[in-house]
């Protein structure tokens, strides 16, 4: 089993594919017993995306390198013990392959706020995403995998995909995702939800278009574009009971928040203001851990290549599903659409997401301008 002990690095060193049908119930009715769990998923999802984008779009100077090097925690190499891997992407001479990040939001029950702490059976993942930076560094694609997806977990048979982290930590999770998708994972990130309200406030809040008047964190807001602070954004993503499509509408809200944060980072002057950038990076990096192979040098190389990426170049999607079901042992599960999923996975594996979207125009539903 891969050693996942904590190490400190050297300073040098869109839109979901919403399936038709009823909302996906929480596994074993967990949400009824743990009311705070679902809103954490939103925070973790956004944090993972922002982590990749910020590390890949900042013109990283020496002071940023120092901040990242001293603040980011690392996992020991989770790829070292893997004997079976998805194939490397084939590229033409002179071209660069896409870079794929597996981003997890950990439901940490051991050491709150420390995403590197893992023990067998102690925690599962609340959010699972593959974030791909295209080989030409012009596009970012974010594919979410429902945590209750019923899949083959190597050595454990059929199980929910989020159980892989509980069974075998980062290494087994990578192996499970690669086996399911055929997508070669290059780097691994685990994020926690601590300090996320502060992160939202660091960028001056986020603008969300509300479809209806709402009361968020005790403030009555009209329909239309509204600037939300951290507390209000949190309340916005926690709501579920009053939404007509339940969890699926909540997914829309989560992804709207993701896009709003990214847009605000690019438009608010955060990236050009050293003081604000340092504060923002500190908030992001204090709630995440990466594999030790993701060095600051690689982050800097990624930064140079992604300097022209903007929020319009980021696409959000969810693995196609085929409805919900119950497992033989009574768990509430999500069945994946094998045929539709295979096409999407192939597009990611071959760095052809743009071509996939052009040839399958109805497969990805763009995030609406206004969200419930």
Regions inferred by a protein language model and the residue ranges of each:
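N-terminal post-signal-peptidase region of extra-cytosolic proteins
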Residues: 82-90, 106-120, 124-129, 163-180, ...
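N-terminal targeting leaders characterized by basic, low-complexity, disordered sequences
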Residues: 1-24
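Extracytoplasmic/secreted envelope proteins and their assembly/folding machinery
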Residues: 76, 125-127, 158, 162, ...
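N-terminal hydrophobic targeting segments that direct proteins to the cell envelope
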Residues: 2-3, 27-123
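Flexible, polar/acidic helix-loop-strand segments at domain edges
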Residues: 97-99, 195, 199-275, 279-281, ...
